[in-house]
Amino acid sequence: ANERPPGSCSSSGCRRCCRPGPYHSHLAVLKAEQAAVFKFPLAPLGCSGLGSALLAAGPGMPGPAGASHLPLELQLRGKLEAAGSGEPGSKAKKGRRSRTVFTELQLMGLEKRFEKQKYLSTPDRIDLAESLGLSQLQVKTWYQNRRMKWKKIVLQGGGLESPTKPKGRPKKNSIPSSEQLSEQERAKETEKPPESPGEPSERQQEE
C-alpha cells in the first residue's frame, strides 16, 4: 500500500520537488526577455543605423567596436555624394552667363546719351553708370553693341555721318600738319611791309 507508481507523488512531495527554485525562475525570465526581443519589429538592416552597425560588427566582433567605424563611413559617403552633386552645379554656373535686362528708363538714358556722344571717356562712363544705376562694364558693353549696330546702319544707308572720336583722344585738327605750318609762315611773311624797288636798302645807305 505504501508503494506508489512511478510518476505519482503525494501532494506534499510534489510541492517539494516541483516547486521552481531560483535557477529555474532565472531561466524563465531570460526566455521571456528573448521572446520579447524577437517579437519586437526591427527596421530593415540596410536602412537603419542599428542594422548597419550589426553588419559592421559581424560575428566574433563586439558591437561597440564595429559601430565605432560607422560614423566615419557615413561621413565619407556623405562627402563623396556632396562633391559629386556639387560638381555639375558648379560647371553649369560657369557655363551660364546672365544677360543684363535694362529697364525702359535705363535704355532711354543710354539712347539719349548715345545720340549726343558716340564714344564715352572713363569719367563720362562713370557718371552715366552712376546716374542710371548700372556698372561701368554694363555701360561699356551696351555702348560697344550699340556702336556696331549704328555703324552697320550708316554703312548700309550710305550716311555721311562719320564716327566721332572720344574726348580723351586728340582730334585730327588739333595737331597742325606740315602744310599748315608752312601756310602760317607764309601768312606771317605777307604781313611784313614790302620793300619798294626805288628805295635803297639799309645796307646801301650805310655804305
Swiss-Prot record:
The keyword Nucleus applies. Expressed predominantly in the facial primordia, developing stomach, and proximal limbs. Residues 157-207 are annotated as: Disordered. Its main location: nucleus. Residues 183-207 have a biased composition (Basic and acidic residues). InterPro entries: HD (IPR001356), HD_metazoa (IPR020479), Homeobox_CS (IPR017970), Homeobox_TF (IPR050848), Homeodomain-like_sf (IPR009057), HTH_motif (IPR000047). GO terms for biological process: regulation of transcription by RNA polymerase II. GO terms for cellular component: nucleus. Keywords: DNA-binding, Homeobox, Nucleus, Transcription, Transcription regulation. Transcription factor, which is involved in craniofacial development, in odontogenic region definition, and in stomach organogenesis. Binds to a regulatory module of the NCAM promoter. Belongs to the BAR homeobox family. This is Homeobox protein BarH-like 1. The lineage of its organism: Eukaryota, Metazoa, Chordata, Craniata, Vertebrata. The gene is BARX1.
